[in-house]
UniProtKB/Swiss-Prot annotation:
One of its GO terms (cellular component) is cytosolic small ribosomal subunit. Keywords: Ribonucleoprotein, Ribosomal protein, RNA-binding, rRNA-binding. CDD domains: Ribosomal_S15p_S13e. PANTHER family: RIBOSOMAL PROTEIN S15, BACTERIAL AND ORGANELLAR, SMALL RIBOSOMAL SUBUNIT PROTEIN US15M. InterPro entries: Ribosomal_uS15, Ribosomal_uS15_bac-type, uS15_NS1_RNA-bd_sf. One of the primary rRNA binding proteins, it binds directly to 16S rRNA where it helps nucleate assembly of the platform of the 30S subunit by binding and bridging several RNA helices of the 16S rRNA. Gene3D superfamilies: 6.10.250.3130, S15/NS1, RNA-binding (1.10.287.10). This is Small ribosomal subunit protein uS15.
């Protein structure tokens, strides 16, 4: 899980203002940080299948948000991908 201070930091850098947690860019940034922290958890705990279900749900949610952003705001999508280093 992402700590509250880290979430606020991500919202400030990717949101439109410091309280804009609903923008797509901020949501994707928070989900990406959460996914990265869960990757470390699954390296240590390979048999934690119940948490893996939530992990896959987060990945799918981020995937849908990225598809929406790519379809509607491609320039924002491209800059976000580069900043978060998601795709190569």
């Amino acid at each position: 899980m992402v700590s509250n201070t880290k979430k606020l930091e991500l919202i400030k850098s990717f949101g439109k203002n410091e309280k804009d947690s609903g923008s797509i860019e901020a949501q994707i940034a928070i989900l990406t940080e959460d996914i990265e922290s869960l990757k470390l958890h699954f390296e240590k705990n390979k048999k934690d299948l119940h948490s893996r279900r939530g992990f896959i749900a987060k990945i799918n949610h981020r995937k849908k948000l990225l598809a929406y952003l790519r379809k509607n705001k491609f320039t924002s999508y491209a800059s976000l991908i580069e900043k978060l280093n998601i795709r190569k």
